[in-house]
Amino acid sequence: MTRITRLIIALLLTTVSLFGQNEFKRVGKSGFGFLKISPSARAAGMGDAFTAVANDVTAIFYNPAGLTNIESFDFSFNHTDWIVNSSIISGVVAMPFGRSGNLGLSFIKFDTEDFEETTVLEPEGTGRTIQAGDIALALAYALKLTDNLSFGFKAQYIEETIDIDKAKAITADFSTYYRTGFRDLTLAMIMKNFGPEAKFLSDKFKLPLYFNINTAMSLIGEQGSAFQWLVSAESAFATDYRDRYHLGTEIWIADLVAVRGGYKFFYDTEDWTVGAGLKLGVGSREIIIDVAYSNFVEYFDPPLRFSIGGSF
């Protein structure tokens, strides 16, 4: 293992202790909540235990280092019917760039239902419509440091709008993707949404900083096999909530149909998830369609996610 490899792993691992120091002081201390919502139907169907899976173009959302698995010009478009009549659309393209690197571009757009303005003097409504929403634009670069270890970096511009007022911020993600050499066992880590405090009007707030550690391996078969059974376990440490854990699984049959399931521990509104995927051949290329369902508490309608992706 090279010096730079050891340095990157050491820097990422030391952040675990920083997250753990304030275990009981973290709830509700960040903004830009839409960044916590999983955009990909494949990842959501696996309970978001995806950091060490991340072998398709949606890796840009979960582990930019995983973009080194991309060998052509790939794309993905995703739609989520979220709670309270809100929705999320996202898209990403990625391609090889340089001898050992890959480049990715992505966007996320979060839209809420318009609502009527109310004031102290007019609590029933003024007749004026208020619009609100969020957007994130990102550029990512992934590089193979060795045959087994990849490093990823993502810079992201985020903006939140409520009527005429805006909050803006720049964030950075740092991640690793390590292929152990034992079967297809993979270890991965990411620090997400690193950046300075943002400001909305006169109020300052922190970004939803996360540090995730994940391991994944196929118990049966491997990618492209007639039958593959993949399992994944992930720990998520956050600055604004207690530690959380994700378990996920994915089964591919004939490298054509996928069935997925997962469970998210210590979430207020979510627990189990299920999903499915279909791979279609189009000439020498392929199109993959994914769908996912997340179980929510009784107060909210369960969100549905749809994704379509492929290569050129």
Regions found by a protein language model. Give the residues of each.
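Subset of outer-membrane beta-barrel
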Residues: 21-312
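Hydrophobic h-region of N-terminal signal peptides that target proteins for export
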Residues: 11-19
